[in-house]
């Protein structure tokens, strides 16, 4: 399964509200993707601990959140389903070196354990997000439900750093990953799909219960479950999430369990 690892799947599932160890993720909980995917040089002493790889699906259906709103352009969603954005991961450069120990001592809702991971972990309630703040001045913001909320949260973190006496700026803000999810509301024959689309699929149910579908255009990774739950990740803009789902939906209907 080149290009996507089981630990990174854990992070994607948790950010989409999926469950690990059979328990749904807590609302607003966040997990960060591997830092190498974000092009951030953090030089951590060790990688953050990863949860063990036991998966189950959400305890509650997401069907209600996937219904079309009256103000949605139906011509762009012929399937009648609009994926819900679950997590936005963004990065920003604060443009100055940071004393992480000082930040952890004086900022609220901040933790720093350099023996585990070389970044301050900071949280704010509105928008409900988590930031990783590195000594280099690079920052990762995760947990927002929209691009605007991610930018707002990143600015709030930068302002907190400024108030602590650092000459923090707000440079090179960039959306690195958008995670969405939806429910097609019918079971899917994953074996048949994997066989017919073997050039794009990885399906190893003994390792991971979902089928991994790597779409070429747009370049999106989809996690497809037998229940009809879908997770989409790898987008830079939300339109890529929507386009990828509309591309895959007719394929999924071909492999609907009867």
From Swiss-Prot:
General function of this protein: General transcription factor that functions at the core of the DNA-binding multiprotein factor TFIID. Binding of TFIID to the TATA box is the initial transcriptional step of the pre-initiation complex (PIC), playing a role in the activation of eukaryotic genes transcribed by RNA polymerase II.
Binding partners and assembly: Belongs to the TFIID complex together with the TBP-associated factors (TAFs). Binds DNA as monomer.
Gene: TFIID
This protein's UniProt keywords: DNA-binding, Nucleus, Repeat, Transcription
PROSITE patterns for this protein: TFIID
Gene Ontology terms, MF aspect: DNA binding
Spans of repeat Sequence: 85-161, 175-252
Annotated Gene Ontology cellular component terms: nucleus
Subcellular location as annotated: Nucleus
Main location class: nucleus
Record lineage: Eukaryota, Amoebozoa, Discosea, Longamoebia, Centramoebida
UniProt-annotated stretches for the region Disordered: 19-80
Family the UniProt entry places it in: Belongs to the TBP family.
The protein, known as: TATA-box-binding protein
């Amino acid at each position: 399964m080149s290009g996507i690892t089981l630990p990174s799947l854990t992070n994607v599932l948790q950010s989409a509200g999926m469950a690990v160890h059979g328990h749904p993720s807590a609302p607003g909980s966040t997990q960060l993707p591997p830092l190498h995917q974000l092009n951030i040089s953090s030089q951590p002493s060790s990688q953050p601990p990863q949860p063990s790889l036991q998966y189950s699906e959400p305890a509650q259906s997401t069907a209600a959140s996937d219904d079309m709103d009256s103000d949605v352009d139906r011509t762009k969603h012929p399937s009648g389903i609009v994926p819900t954005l679950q997590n936005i991961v963004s990065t920003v450069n604060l443009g100055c070196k940071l004393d992480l120990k000082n930040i952890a001592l004086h900022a609220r809702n901040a933790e720093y354990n350099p023996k585990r991971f070389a970044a301050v972990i900071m949280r704010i309630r509105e928008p409900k997000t988590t930031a990783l703040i590195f000594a280099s001045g690079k920052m990762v913001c995760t947990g927002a439900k929209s691009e605007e909320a991610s930018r707002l949260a990143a600015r709030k973190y930068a302002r907190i750093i400024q108030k602590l006496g650092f000459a923090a700026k707000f440079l090179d803000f960039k959306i690195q990953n958008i995670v969405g999810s939806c429910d097609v509301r019918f079971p899917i024959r994953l074996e048949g799909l994997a066989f017919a689309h073997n050039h794009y699929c990885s399906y190893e149910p003994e390792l991971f219960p979902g089928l991994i579908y790597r779409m070429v255009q747009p370049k999106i990774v989809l996690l497809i479950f037998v229940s009809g739950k879908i997770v989409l990740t790898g987008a830079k803009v939300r339109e890529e999430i929507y386009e990828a789902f509309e591309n895959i939906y007719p394929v999924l209907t071909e492999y609907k369990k009867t």
